[in-house]
Amino acid sequence: MSAGGHGVSRRQLLVSGVCAAPGISLAGSRPRVTHGVQTGDVALGRAVVWARSDRPAQLVVEYATTPSFGGRRRVRGTVASAQSGWTARALIHPPPGQTIFVRAWFEDGRTRGEPAMARFCTPADGVRILWSGDTAGQGYGINPEWGGMRIYETMRRREPHVFIHCGDTIYADGPIPAEVRTPLGVWRNWTMPEKLKVAETLDEFRASYLYNLHDDNVRRFNAEVAQMWLWDDHEVRNNWSPGADLAGDGRYREKDISVLARRARQAFLEFAPIGYASRAEALIFRHLPVGPLVDLFALDMRSYRGPNNWNRQIMESGETAYLGERQLSWLADGLERSRGLWKIIAADMPLGVVVSDGRDAQGRPRFENCANGDGPPLGRELEIARLLQAIKRLNLRNVIWVTADVHYTAAHHFHPDRAQFKDFLPFWEFVSGPLNAGTFGPSPLDNTFGPQVIYCKAPPPGQSNLPPSAGLQFFGEIEIDRSSRCATVTLRDIGGGVLFSQRLEPA
């Protein structure tokens, strides 16, 4: 990550970025942290601190291992500007195994704003990781009568070291109306003008992130838990892939999916607590060495895929691309080099669940992820088969997959004895979500890699798109014990109750 704002002069702050935020007078007032502080991408010896300003100003961060800020260190971060959606970030270097106390403020060359506070824990040996996905989907937004996005408060109380958001961090294509009528009654949202339509402009994509930050539970969670964000389809549009045809979707005046994707990516990188030297060079797939017991690998299943299609090609090509060659090689190499006992791969879509995307011009089923129905590897499955082969060839043990996307929770065990393709080591995949969205499922499995449903919690037969008030909102937890070195994976409900738990012994 660049020190972008380091060495920025008073004159640069006052004139070079200076298209002021609308409605803000620079004179006589202080720059303000508008939506709290987030921390993210915590790895050995580094973390990112994120905040948003109300005007052109430079982010300044102090951090320490005591609440009194004795022995504090100060870092100057990037400059918030109109070009960054008024967001800024700073790279800090905290010690492992500590609670890190953070205060962040903005300076505009004339004045220093009031600090906003945060804290997070850096892992050492024992680690607690949560994951889930799907925030503010299907029109279910912030319902003050119900207590807002309550699952974030439940997760905060679990005191994790890291939370992995497996994607659908927003629903850019999902307006938030004032009311949603459901079989359980009327769901009443707090909403705002930008969320009454689908996102098309850059500012509308930004507004979806700002909407979530209006929730008290989300902001409290952000201020106490370091995060690792992935993206999925709804950051752009449902089932987004290159070449998607918007001609028949009257909600969109902008019909070029590549234009929407470019704007969506910029907004995601502005609001995600990710470190990077420049947005143009930023990668959503990345490796976070959390400690001696665990390495995290975040995947990007969107940026490098070919168009969604019938997905049953017998040879790889641009049409079958999923992770893409660069990311696939990076992942295999990173897993081989990993020093963490447990290797957790965070994906935005499950491997063996069939996710459909309508039909193509020839009337053939079209698929959204790699799964395409029973049988040998075809289409996008060819990449996954190569990856699983590499893991076996390198004898890489203790690999766990976590994901979201399908709006229910499940534990899947993959084994070559049940599979059509047999050249891989057995592994587990755990699914959890949604966080604050409609609940669906379950979806059918594809037997190519031999998945078995060990546990599943979804709506009763005949019911779907249930509101958060139905109680079927889920997150997962991985607890790695420093003494036994075992990983215990637990699927939890909106109140934190245990639905399923699996203890995994290290190989």
Please name every model-derived segment.
Residues S2-C19, G23-A507:
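Metal-dependent phosphoester/phosphodiester hydrolase catalytic core
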